[in-house]
């Protein structure tokens, strides 16, 4: 409770609310006390009261630009308003005094005095009170002063990392690292050998710029690292700074943009000023698309805060003043939405594509991340690399980390191949749900569904090999089949894609042939198949009818040119027809394969119902010999205590 109370006390908004009510109450009571139970009347009412002879005393007192008039009634008046704060129903009170305010015009004051004298009212004129002026001034200024104080305090807190000084709100939020603090080297970055070769010259520029400038070469102003998330763009930037031995300033693109106009541009100026003082230096901007999107094409357009920030960044990178010794390295996975002025030579001279690693790169990455993990002798990192096509560095690190967690969960002292195999499944499909209650009918349906995918994949194995099939539920899937490419592929042929389409259709076709039903289990298969078939027709020009024309590209996100419809209704209809034709062709091919291999299909399904998971060796044996490998056959016997405990640990 004490911690919660301390948090409430430190909350600036609660203090602001408290001060507001305090000042409001002070003003209210101050005005109430000054009135002393009097009634406020206007000039017309004042003249009427004097004319009626109901004024006993009248006092004039100048107060700044007005004259305050107060007086006493001869006959007190009744009022239901009263003064001060009333907590109950207001009572009828007698008002003996009144106040009014008039402008200091000579004719008005003299006429009012003459009128009061004629009606036998006692008139008194007082000099202006200096203390009253200061009190009124204080009451007017104090609330605004308190408000500004809290605003500046909150702005100082929002400045983050620059102390509590409110004037640091526009300072850069970049994290600065000295060359001694950067321990990352090129040897720590695996699977990006070509990318490192592109960055070697940048390191040489920073180490020995005279070697290049004497030949008339210009130091690159910036390097743009583009690639999918998790490929190691940030790590590469740190490695460049580490190899060059220069200070490293890192900041996210979103840190520049705030709700206050001009703050982003101020932070850009501050960042480059700090880098100039430490030159030679590297500025790393992560996710630069947050601030570098094309100007004038977002929602609302116009010269908004983001555009001002981008303009300042353009000027700093290649404006009137040079930035000798400063290299900007930026990372993004959406270079298509960046402003063309940012991508031109002179700003980002080098564009390095950091792609997904090949099998050798994946093996090297696994070796780097396995340095601090005890691995059993049966762990083959080369095999793991072959089983993880398309994985980036972050995915591979996650696989080994999950394997370590699985081994710890099973009370092991080292990580073996079964732990890594389980980790791969968890990363690809999610955690297993062995405790999930599934009816026998559904288990059979899932088994034949996955066996359908498997048998089609076994027959059409020119490009891909069936690696594993299981009916253990994981994530949203009731089961799944994994088919891996025989080797890393940069390009896919039309036949390769048709084989994949047939494999995706194998599950639904098996349901229809064996059980004569259609279930929702094939929804994800259809989604993938439709996307692939549409890409074949609209992007890759693989339709004989429509020809080698690209009808659709990558749909732009907010910040780039919005896609406009550039095809006719007839062409759109023909595209749909071609997509449907490809999918029907794949469906017929899958049906033909399953009908021709009914016995093998049944064997795989029955093995799945018995063992739940089959690896590539077991699948191959069933396909070629019709039997499971002898090593897998298990004898039925009563389990000992140690065997029961071991089995429980394996199932955790």
Curated annotation (Swiss-Prot):
It is a multi-pass membrane protein. ATP binds at residues 227-234. Homohexamer. Residues 1-11, 153-652 are cytoplasmic. Acts as a processive, ATP-dependent zinc metallopeptidase for both cytoplasmic and membrane proteins. Plays a role in the quality control of integral membrane proteins. In the central section; belongs to the AAA ATPase family. InterPro entries: AAA+_ATPase, AAA_lid_3, ATPase_AAA_core, ATPase_AAA_CS, FtsH, P-loop_NTPase, Pept_M41_FtsH_extracell, Peptidase_M41. PROSITE patterns: AAA. One of its GO terms (cellular component) is plasma membrane. The chain crosses the membrane at residues 12-32, 132-152. Its EC number is 3.4.24.-. One of its GO terms (molecular function) is ATP hydrolysis activity. This is ATP-dependent zinc metalloprotease FtsH. The active site is at residue 450. Binds 1 zinc ion per subunit. Keywords: ATP-binding, Cell membrane, Hydrolase, Membrane, Metal-binding, Metalloprotease, Nucleotide-binding, Protease, Transmembrane, Transmembrane helix, Zinc. Residues 628-652 are annotated as: Disordered. GO terms for biological process: protein catabolic process; proteolysis. It is found in: Cell membrane. Residues 33-131 are extracellular. Its cofactor is Zn(2+). Zn(2+) binds at residues 449, 453, 525. SUPFAM superfamilies: FtsH protease domain-like (SSF140990), P-loop containing nucleoside triphosphate hydrolases (SSF52540). Residues 634-652 have a biased composition (Basic and acidic residues).
